[in-house]
């Protein structure tokens, strides 16, 4: 029994060492960053969702993922904000981790997603 408990504790500890979360940012703070043009905002939703409406100025990850580096600024400290559908959606992680892999260090997650953005009655932009 002690070995089982030790094994479980080790597994939990190892899992927490590799867990990675990006700091959350509220929809109103994202809107402020969008208006000030101080961040790159990445929509990690499907192309259809992006076309239906996204945060103004947001880039579609589906459209840029194969050449992400060309879509991001040279300054690796630039604020990168990734979002997807709602707090239960994990699609944003692909975009956030891709930016992190390119060396970006200031990455945040709008966990409310486009659903929370819409609930807050913030403006959206139709996609292309």
Q: Where do the language-model regions lie?
A:
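Rhodanese-like catalytic fold shared by cysteine-dependent sulfurtransferases
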Residues: 2-6, 15-28, 39, 51-82, ...
């Amino acid at each position: 029994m002690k070995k089982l408990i030790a094994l479980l504790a080790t597994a939990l500890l190892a899992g927490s060492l590799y867990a990675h979360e990006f700091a959350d940012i509220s929809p109103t703070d994202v809107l402020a960053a969008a208006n000030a043009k101080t961040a790159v905002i990445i929509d990690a939703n499907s192309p259809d969702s992006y076309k239906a409406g996204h945060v103004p100025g947001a880039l579609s990850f589906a459209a840029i993922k194969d050449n992400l580096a060309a879509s991001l600024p040279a300054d690796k400290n630039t604020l990168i904000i990734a979002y997807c559908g709602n707090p239960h959606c994990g699609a944003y992680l692909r975009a956030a981790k891709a930016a992190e892999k390119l060396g970006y260090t200031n990455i945040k997650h709008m966990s409310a997603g486009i659903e929370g953005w819409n609930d807050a009655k913030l403006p959206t932009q139709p996609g292309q």
